[in-house]
């Protein structure tokens, strides 16, 4: 299977940008995860109505960029981790109680 985007390259570029901006200073993984949570809160604000706002996609991108930053900071091969997780999900048996 071919992937047109290298997630590790995106994570690297995000990490470089964070360093350049001075936003990558001795954060613990927990502190970094809490920034993901804050981005999730911002995304939730964009879907409070019946239809998501135009800014919803920006907030989703912010979540992904935060995750890329965490991956880069912690030496995680995020692309392989995502592929491994997707493959593991394929092994799950469907649960009729979950599908509504």
Give the positions of each predicted feature.
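Flexible "arm" and connector segments at domain edges
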Residues: 1-60, 64-100
């Amino acid at each position: 299977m071919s992937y047109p985007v290298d997630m590790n390259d995106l994570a690297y570029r995000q990490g470089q940008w964070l360093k350049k901006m001075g936003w990558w200073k001795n954060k613990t993984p927990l502190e970094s995860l809490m920034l993901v949570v804050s981005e999730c809160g911002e995304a939730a604000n964009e879907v409070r109505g019946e239809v998501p706002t135009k800014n919803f996609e920006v907030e989703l991108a912010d979540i992904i960029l935060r995750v890329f930053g965490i991956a880069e900071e912690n030496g995680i091969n995020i692309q392989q981790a995502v592929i491994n997780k997707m493959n593991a999900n394929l092994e799950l048996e469907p649960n009729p109680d979950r599908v509504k």
